[in-house]
């Protein structure tokens, strides 16, 4: 089963990407090198928690 995960920038800009991963085959936290438009360079994005809040 594929679960939605959030990739958070390690540059500390607050920028994030959302993607899916198969938890059965990838049990460790995902890390990817992607472009951060706020920092204007490629940085490592690590898997973070998705908040379940309703906005209030």
From Swiss-Prot:
InterPro entries reported in the protein's UniProt record: Ribosomal_bL33, Ribosomal_bL33_CS, Ribosomal_bL33_sf, Ribosomal_zn-bd
Annotated TM spans: none
One Gene Ontology biological process: translation
Organism superkingdom: Bacteria
Protein name in the entry: Large ribosomal subunit protein bL33C
PANTHER family reported in the protein's UniProt record: 54S RIBOSOMAL PROTEIN L39, MITOCHONDRIAL, LARGE RIBOSOMAL SUBUNIT PROTEIN BL33M
Annotated GO CC locations: cytosolic large ribosomal subunit
Any single Pfam family the record assigns to this protein: Ribosomal_L33
Similarity remark: Belongs to the bacterial ribosomal protein bL33 family.
Single Gene Ontology MF annotation: structural constituent of ribosome
Assigned keywords, A-Z: Ribonucleoprotein, Ribosomal protein
């Amino acid at each position: 089963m594929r679960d939605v995960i959030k990739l958070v920038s390690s540059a500390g800009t607050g920028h994030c990407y959302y993607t899916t991963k198969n938890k059965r085959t990838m049990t460790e936290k995902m890390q990817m090198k992607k472009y951060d438009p706020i920092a204007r360079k490629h940085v490592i994005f690590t898997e973070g928690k998705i908040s379940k809040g309703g906005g209030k």
